[in-house]
């Protein structure tokens, strides 16, 4: 997954963390486009599979993990890293916005 994306900016405040991520040209925007990489992320952060997932098919992230946007995967990884480090506090979900340029993501 080296060279997949660049983190342009990270802003941390008391109640949230925001990241601006640019997916490099030619890299997959959907998890289904690189299922091996998606599986590697799962093996590194297996707890994301059981995350509640609102607005997608199924109830848990595992229900859509193999066919979702890369930004959605990064959102769940971010929430889980915050949980594992104790920085999440009351945060239990994330929000992702894709700009007019599909490769620029705001998590």
Protein language model regions, located:
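Conserved small/polar residues in nucleotide/adenosyl-binding loops
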Residues: 105-107
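His/Glu-rich zincin catalytic helix
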Residues: 1-86
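Post-HEXXH active-site segment of zinc metalloproteases
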Residues: 84-100
């Amino acid at each position: 997954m080296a060279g997949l994306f660049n983190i342009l900016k990270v802003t941390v405040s008391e109640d949230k963390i925001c990241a601006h991520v640019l997916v490099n040209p030619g890299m997959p925007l959907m998890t289904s486009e690189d299922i091996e990489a998606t599986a590697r992320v799962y093996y590194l952060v297996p707890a994301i599979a059981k995350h509640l997932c609102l607005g997608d098919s199924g109830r848990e992230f595992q229900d859509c993990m193999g066919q979702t946007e890369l930004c959605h995967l990064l959102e769940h990884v971010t929430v889980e890293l915050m949980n594992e480090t104790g920085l999440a506090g009351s945060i239990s979900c994330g929000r992702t916005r894709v700009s007019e340029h599909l490769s620029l993501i705001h998590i």
